[in-house]
Every structure is written in C-alpha cells, then in structure tokens.
Amino acid sequence: MSVRLATPRTLVRPAGEADATALWQFRMENRQHLAPWEPLREERYYTQGHCAQTIADWRESIRLDRGYPFLVLDPGEREVIGTFNLANVVRGVFQACHLGYAVAQRWQGQGLMREALESGLDWAFGPLGLHRVMANYMPRNERSGKLLERLGFEREGYAKRYLCIAGVWEDLIAGLQR
C-alpha cells in the first residue's frame, strides 16, 4: 500500500522495513511517557528485533484489510513524531474501525497529531471507505480527550473496566467520529 499523506508539518505513511530503527528510537525515548497509557510491555518490546517484527505484522494487517498502522514523521522522514492505527477494521454492514495513537513527549502540545489524524481520518472516510471510526480514552488523559474533541469525536458512553492498561483495568470514555 503506497499511502503518503502530507500535512504542513508531518508526513504520514505506513512503516517499511527500513523504519525499524526509527520505531525503536521512538519506543525507547518515550517508554516512560507512554507507559501510563499502554498495556504492560515485555522487555523484548523495546528491542530492534521486536520493532522489525511489529512492522512486518503491521504490513500483514494492511494486506488483510484488518488494520492500517501509520507512522507520523517529520517532513524529512528522520524522526517518528508519533504513530496511529486504524485497527480492528470491520467491513460489511458496519464499515468501521478503532483509532489508537501515541505521540512523542517532545512533540506533544504542538498540534502535530491533530494535523496527522485529520489527514488520516480524511483518508479513512474517503479512499478506505469507512463509515465510522471509534476512539476511547481514559478519563484522566485529558490531552487525549481534548484532541478527540478537536477532531470532531462525540462522547458516546462510559465503559467501566474496559481495557487493561499498565496492569490496571481502566474505565474509558467511548466516542465516535462523525
């Protein structure tokens, strides 16, 4: 799949084999920053070999139309600013997916993920042909809630003990896009 979405300050595209080191650097530099918002990770998650396998798995997910993981890069493609995934794609009468995302600590608060996600959502509702994109966030993750709100997501409900994040079953606010 050769999707390249350029925004004024980012380039959004699927990861290729050559991106394993950049993904590893992103994971290592943001390990503590992202830990409160992610599942518990085994130590091997933070190896270059695991990053290479992750990219291979992502590419297979795209091939099977099950998910569309993207890197958010600086325009020169030197650094991973963040990642997002249009995951758990369901076709047929539903035409929907779940959105997940992460942004590097040093890039947060600059509107870069909003820019990248606007581009990705336009692609999801356009060429990908989705009707619904769902996103959930933990109530204490106010930054995530504000980002989703700016992207036009509307609160749909409150799911108690919905996902195991950082070893704890967390409540999530459920939302949808358009």
Q: How would you describe each model-predicted region?
A:
Residues H33-A56:
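Conserved GNAT-fold acetyl-CoA-binding loop/helix
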